[in-house]
């Protein structure tokens, strides 16, 4: 069954929604943008999060030392890396105990990446859905992000067969997380699907 990450969590109501709906991963954005949270905010939200939900920190070209400081403070379990990341940096994070997601925005997936998960994303919270039929089936753990909503996630899972799906703005109403949309998204993503090879 596909895993679900709800990203861009900022408020206690967001945490309640993901706890209730049964998300697998919760995303805190440390990179600049409208969903950005501070370390203090992330720690406070983490206290409210169900213990079975793993936390992901979203970073853009952040120095390894800064990421490790946030991890060592207890705010995150996984680092999601946008921008340029070297194999040495990824390995350094992993050796410290972090799982690593490397993000590929509108570019070919690097199957030689050292990361634990490879993410394909339409880029920078654009809300644009990728050409799902162009995404190759790979043996590595794959995360699908960008433009997903409760209305299209089931088809996306069927077409791409990812390990995980990731959503932020697709479960928002007027710029705020919508508990009903979060529940619908997770239900649709995790609904029993018979995978078929779709040409």
Swiss-Prot record:
Pfam families with a match to the protein in the record: PRAI (PF00697)
Top enzyme category: isomerase
Annotated Gene3D superfamilies: Aldolase class I
CDD domains, per the entry: PRAI
Membrane spanning residue stretches: none
Keyword list, A-Z: Amino-acid biosynthesis, Aromatic amino acid biosynthesis, Isomerase, Tryptophan biosynthesis
Keyword Isomerase: yes
Reaction equation(s) it catalyzes: N-(5-phospho-beta-D-ribosyl)anthranilate = 1-(2-carboxyphenylamino)-1-deoxy-D-ribulose 5-phosphate
InterPro entries xref list: Aldolase_TIM, PRAI_dom, RibuloseP-bd_barrel, TrpF_fam
Pathway membership, UniProt: Amino-acid biosynthesis; L-tryptophan biosynthesis; L-tryptophan from chorismate: step 3/5
UniProt-recorded Gene Ontology molecular function terms: phosphoribosylanthranilate isomerase activity
GO BP term, pick one: L-tryptophan biosynthetic process
EC number(s) recorded for this UniProt protein: 5.3.1.24
Family: Belongs to the TrpF family.
Protein's UniProt name: N-(5'-phosphoribosyl)anthranilate isomerase
Species this chain originates from: Lacticaseibacillus casei
């Amino acid at each position: 069954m596909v895993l679900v990450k709800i990203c861009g969590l900022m408020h206690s109501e967001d945490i309640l929604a993901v706890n209730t709906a049964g998300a697998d991963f919760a995303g805190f954005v440390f990179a600049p943008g409208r969903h950005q949270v501070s370390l203090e905010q992330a720690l406070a939200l983490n206290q409210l999060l169900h213990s079975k939900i793993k936390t992901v920190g979203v970073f853009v070209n952040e120095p390894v030392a800064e990421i490790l400081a946030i991890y060592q403070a207890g705010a995150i379990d996984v680092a999601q890396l946008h921008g340029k990341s070297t194999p040495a940096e990824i390995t350094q994070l992993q050796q410290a105990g972090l799982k690593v997601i490397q993000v590929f925005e509108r570019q070919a997936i690097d199957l030689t990446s050292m990361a634990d998960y490879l993410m394909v994303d339409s880029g920078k919270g654009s809300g644009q859905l990728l050409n799902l039929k162009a995404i190759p089936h790979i043996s590595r753990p794959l995360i699908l992000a960008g433009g997903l909503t409760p209305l299209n996630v089931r088809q996306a899972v069927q077409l791409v067969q990812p390990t995980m799906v990731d959503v932020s703005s697709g479960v928002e109403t007027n710029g705020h997380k919508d508990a009903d949309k979060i529940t619908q998204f997770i239900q649709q993503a995790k609904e029993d699907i018979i995978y078929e090879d779709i040409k």
